[in-house]
Amino acid sequence: MMKTKSEVLIFFFTLVLLLSMASSVILREDGFAPPKPSPTTHEKASTKGDRDGVECKNSDSEEECLVKKTVAAHTDYIYTQDLNLSP
């Protein structure tokens, strides 16, 4: 029985689609997927809160306190962005 061109085209398209999906799953199982954040890193970030080394005393206004915290966080980011903190 002779197949039409459209049936052959659909067959090859489906085959390519299935192979590409299978190859992406295999690559992810081998460790080529982006790393997942560890729970300890997430816990440290969530429990850190306002304890970032900047203390706002009662004499500081809310705006001054926010500026101090922003500068401290930015400085921390600058000096730690090249570090590999993953365990």
UniProtKB/Swiss-Prot annotation:
GO cellular component, one term: extracellular matrix
Subcellular location: Secreted
Region Disordered: start-end pairs: 31-59
UniProt key word Secreted: yes
Tissues and organs where the protein is expressed, per its UniProt entry: Expressed only in roots.
InterPro entries, alphabetized: Phytosulfokine
Biological processes annotated in GO: cell differentiation; cell population proliferation
Pfam family, one: PSK
Keywords, sorted A to Z: Developmental protein, Differentiation, Growth factor, Secreted, Signal, Sulfation
Biased composition range(s): Basic and acidic residues: 41-59
Recorded GO MF terms: growth factor activity
Physiological role: Promotes plant cell differentiation, organogenesis and somatic embryogenesis as well as cell proliferation.
Listed name of the protein: Phytosulfokines 1
Annotated organism of origin: Arabidopsis thaliana
